[in-house]
């Protein structure tokens, strides 16, 4: 019942959030009549609203996964998917002087919903970026039956027993919804995949094992 409520609420919030974003954009279009202080306040509201939009999208996605609303499957080339994701985030990595390395150790093709496959890769890579060190490194390894995302990061290991919980606070940073790894876990459960976390030599590592 709780999951159903969250799903319904997330669906209903889409339109009001979109309306708010449009109205803010209209205000910005009137920038010549606004002071710098007013523009600064609008920018703060926009950042908060962007966060709420991301949060709502994640909640809606989790609700759809829970309700089995992704029945369509096809053969997904994970090697190509990882390359596209890396290219999409290239400028973001450069902003923090982070190095991205793709280790292509073998072809990995899996049968699953392509949108959900994209969510797994994107959320793992974004998690590595958010929790990685500026000037650090992210290494994504694609092998015949395994996807690994590792990053250098300050601090010790995360709480492996709760890191995939929804709204887990221990790993949450400013701007993060706290739902990315929960989405990864939900998709893996849906397809019977194994996702695990480890911490070795100052590196956080997430692995997803695919059945033969």
What are these model-derived regions, one by one?
Residues 192-193, 197:
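Conserved glycine-rich
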Residues 67-72, 109-112:
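Conserved micro-motifs of the catalytic ATP-binding
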Residues 28-39:
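Short acidic helix/loop segment immediately C-terminal to the autophosphorylated histidine
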Residues 128-129:
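Short helix-loop "hinge" at the ATP-lid/N-box region of the Bergerat-fold HATPase_c
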Residues 156-167:
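Short conserved segment of the HATPase_c
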Residues 44-52:
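Short alpha-helical segment of the dimerization/phosphotransfer core of two-component systems
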Residues 74, 99-109:
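Conserved catalytic submotifs in the C-terminal HATPase_c
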């Amino acid at each position: 019942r709780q999951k159903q409520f969250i799903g319904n609420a997330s669906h209903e919030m889409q339109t009001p959030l979109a309306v708010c974003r449009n109205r803010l954009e209209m205000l910005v279009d009137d920038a010549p009549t606004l002071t710098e202080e007013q523009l600064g306040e609008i920018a703060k509201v926009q950042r908060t609203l962007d966060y709420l939009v991301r949060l709502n999208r994640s909640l809606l996605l989790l609700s759809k996964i829970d309700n089995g609303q992704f029945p369509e499957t096809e053969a997904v080339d994970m090697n190509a998917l990882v390359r596209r994701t890396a290219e999409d985030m290239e400028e973001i990595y450069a902003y923090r002087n982070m190095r991205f390395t793709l280790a292509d150790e073998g072809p990995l093709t899996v049968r699953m919903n392509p949108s959900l496959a994209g969510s797994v890769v994107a959320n793992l890579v974004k998690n590595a970026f958010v929790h990685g060190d500026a000037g650090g490194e992210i290494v994504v390894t694609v092998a015949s039956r395994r996807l690994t995302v590792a990053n250098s990061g300050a601090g010790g290991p995360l709480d492996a027993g709760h890191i995939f919980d929804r709204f887990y606070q221990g790993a949450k940073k400013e701007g993060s919804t706290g739902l990315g790894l929960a989405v990864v876990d939900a998709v893996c459960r849906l397809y019977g995949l194994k996702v695990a976390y480890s911490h070795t030599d100052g590196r956080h590592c997430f692995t997803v094992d695919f059945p033969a």
